[in-house]
Amino acid sequence: MSFVPGQENAGSRSSSGNRAGNGILKKTTWADQTERGNRGRRNHPKQTATTQPNAGSVVPHYSWFSGITQFQKGKEFQFAQGQGVPIASGIPASEQKGYWYRHNRRSFKTPDGQHKQLLPRWYFYYLGTGPHAGAEYGDDIEGVVWVASQQADTKTTADVVERDPSSHEAIPTRFAPGTVLPQGFYVEGSGRSAPASRSGSRSQSRGPNNRARSSSNQRQPASAVKPDMAEEIAALVLAKLGKDAGQPKQVTKQSAKEVRQKILTKPRQKRTPNKQCPVQQCFGKRGPNQNFGGSEMLKLGTSDPQFPILAELAPTPSAFFFGSKLELVKKNSGGADEPTKDVYELQYSGAIRFDSTLPGFETIMKVLTENLNAYQDQAGSVDLVSPKPPRRGRRQAQEKKDEVDNVSVAKPKSLVQRNVSRELTPEDRSLLAQILDDGVVPDGLEDDSNV
């Protein structure tokens, strides 16, 4: 009597047509349907455990269980004594013996052109089956780790049939309680085979006609995700992160300008202000109709650390439409030289209600107090976002410079001359007449009142 994993009290149900003369299952590739897809094509030599290339993607035999993948380099794959045999219903403890076989996976090309080898994946085979069916328990074989339960007799082979993929799906790998998984490894795809198994059982219960249609629907296109593809994508992402993670992203004037232009091209109600495009550039200056935002929040926009707690108060789209008073108003279009277009405003008014039981209530009140009508406190100060002066062309700037060079600049007036409008008194005129040799007061010093 041979045992079948996953079936209670199962007899020998193995398919003799899938066995070679030495009792080993036929070699195949990852997908169960590869052999059917290659019908009519040129036959290639089958790979064995000894001829499998180091970078190959071929799994020589079908394991009853999903694999265990290594994700950290330099880690050793080993289990404590009495541990490491996957558990499956229908297999007694005396037959829980076998080995883990290391499968070397293919390499991939990184963005910088280098080839990187994927870390290996391990598969379990019962003693007397798999790529080393003729080996005895404990033989020193490269890429093989022997495991057995305490009750198993390792001197005899396990009375377990080999898996026929047309009849049995792979079982997600599970271990007995207390088993310690080797560090740097994880169990691969615990639910990868379950959907196919359930759909197959449903198709069998529907009858022969539906069964044929169901099998045709399960055919995978050429672009379907392969088991190794997830690891390749993850490795590419990690390689990219490892290359750029230590380099802080620098914001240049050009990049800031691009971000600002991208934001301003959006409709006004879809803009999100930040450091590159402040609040007043997105929504205009603060005033009675737009009265929220202190100096710091106007500069940082949504990047302000206080903004997320305010965002919790923002209404949802449904609350906006169903909890507000809405009014559709038609506005005048642009000037006479602009094309005619209909412009509308959806004007709204509503309220956001909250009480002191709201988490972060005190912080919310503090932030609201600091930012509501903050423009009134800054009315006498310079605008936070002052418009930049228009750039002068090179020729215009040179002409301006020449004008300045050709003008004789008078000395600045003294404080007395700037602040006091003086009138000459008779005493002043007499004093000046004594100073001047000719005794005549210059016209420039005559009393303004006589002009």
UniProtKB/Swiss-Prot annotation:
Residues 9-23, 189-208 have a biased composition (Low complexity). Residues 263-380 are annotated as: Dimerization. Signal peptide: none annotated. Residues 60-189 form the CoV N NTD domain. RNA binds at R105, R121, R163. The modification Phosphoserine is found at S166, S190, S386, S421. Residues 256-379 form the CoV N CTD domain. The keyword Transport does not apply. It holds the Pfam family CoV_nucleocap. GO terms for cellular component: host cell endoplasmic reticulum-Golgi intermediate compartment; host cell Golgi apparatus; ribonucleoprotein complex; viral nucleocapsid. ADP-ribosylated. The ADP-ribosylation is retained in the virion during infection. One of its GO terms (molecular function) is RNA binding. Its main location: virion. Residues 52-193 are annotated as: RNA-binding. InterPro entries: N_prot_C_CoV, N_prot_N_CoV, NCAP_bCoV, Nucleocap_CoV, Nucleocapsid_C, Nucleocapsid_N. Belongs to the betacoronavirus nucleocapsid protein family. Packages the positive strand viral genome RNA into a helical ribonucleocapsid (RNP) and plays a fundamental role during virion assembly through its interactions with the viral genome and membrane protein M. Plays an important role in enhancing the efficiency of subgenomic viral RNA transcription as well as viral replication. This is Nucleoprotein. The gene is N.
